[in-house]
Amino acid sequence: DGPDDTGVQGDNLTNRSQPTFILKDVDPDAASVMVSVNHGGTTTTFAATNGAGGWRFTPASDWTDGAYTLSVTVTDKAGNVSHSAPLTVNVDTHVTIDSIVLVNDSSFIGDNLTNEVRPHFRVTVPGDVNVVRLSLNDGKTWGNATQSASGDWEYIWPDDVTEGKHTLTVEATDIAGNKATQMLEFIIDTTLSTPTITLDAVDDSGVAGDNITNEKTPGFTINGIDADASQVMVVVTHNGKSKELALTQVSGRWHFTPDSDWTDGNYTLTVKVEDKAGNMSQSSPLTVTVDTQTVISSIVLVNDSGIVGDKMTNNVHPHFRVTVPEDVNVVRLSIDGGTTWGNATQSAVKGIWNYNWPTDVGDGKYTLMVEAIDAAGNKATQTLEFIVDATLSVPTITLDTANDSGVAGDNITNEKTPGFTINGIDADAIRVAVQVTHNGTNQEVELTQIGGQWHFTPASNWVDGNYTLTVKVEDRAGNVSQSAPLAVTIDTQTEINNIVLV
């Protein structure tokens, strides 16, 4: 029957399980019209019915899918018998959609997530399917897939599909007219936030925001990670070598801390993120300097006034010069055990710092403390012992009593090599000299302490006349002092000019 020929007209293919057959050319005097049906090797005969539309045959029960061969036998009242040519009909009452695949699934295969705005679908159906169409709007509009050489049906969406979750409807129609519908949920995700990485404030040990740290295992906070991130990596580059480390979110936070100590130097960190859709994004690089130590190279007492390097000065405002690495930004000094500090000033040459004590420092021995702090917050402390000695006693020189041969204390002697006693010489004196002036000529003689006493005796006889002696003293701190001049007269002879009897 025409309505039951559900495929291509005349192909004798039907999706009806009880198809109706029209029997034609049956004479009016037919006494018996029988239909023989062969299916699966078994033949069953049924009586046709004659109604208003003529002779017809409809199975009394559903036929299963398969091929059926029908032949009609007509017997008229006179006993004549006639047979029709056999008719083979195929019953096909259903079709299936075997699979729907999102071809450009861009991340984990089978998660139906893509970062392509024009998704590509592959539909696998039985070979007798001749139409496959797809819709994203509940069947309001359809797109027809194309069969490939492999037999699968392909469809690439011709227009951009918006981000979000979508329901794909696929309808397959076979040549028997059967239809199958199946749906596939998929997600389009084409965007991924740009991550950021920052050095933890607690580890930014120098000036805030300078990304210099004295921590060997500094911590980094990572932000801008989307909830659908499937992989978060940190790439660390140091001395030309890069290392990639996978991160895991802990307690809702993304954080990175090296698993071993970093040596001093520069490190560049970049965060790379991939989401479930396969989108990728990376942060701007962050360069961090690890600086875990600093040193004080030298401390010099600039106005060391005695022997160079003995750290002794006669200046009550000692001047110190401190040499440190160029990244040091604070140098401070103390001579009271760190109770009070004075800040040094950096000179025009980086790494050289100077400090002049602003108030008088009394005589005595001191311990200078110097503290240097670099840009990373590292501290180095060093001490220097120094002495301030700004005083020197005034020496005295006297003619030995034994040689004061005239009136005691008149400093007139008849000794050609008179002796002189020198007092007021401090224990730290490093030079004691006697300057002798006679007839406009000066001679300076250095003395040595003997037996705990300072004494001077001319090395050769002095001729008669007047002599002026001055003692000059210098101590280790460079202080200089001299005695008041002592005038001595040498008179080794006398004469009787005449004798008169009065």
Model-identified regions with their sequence ranges:
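Short, solvent-exposed loop/edge segments of extracellular or virion-exposed proteins
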Residues: 1-14, 98-114, 196-213, 295-313, ...
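Short strand-edge motifs at loop-to-beta-strand transitions and within beta-strands
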Residues: 53-57, 151-155, 252-256, 351-355, ...
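Structural beta-strand segments of beta-rich domains
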Residues: 17-21, 117-121, 216-220, 316-320, ...
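Surface-exposed, short loops/turns at beta-strand junctions within beta-sandwich domains
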Residues: 59-67, 157-165, 258-266, 357-365, ...
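Flexible, low-complexity linkers/stalks enriched in Thr/Pro that connect modular domains
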Residues: 1, 76, 85-103, 180-200, ...
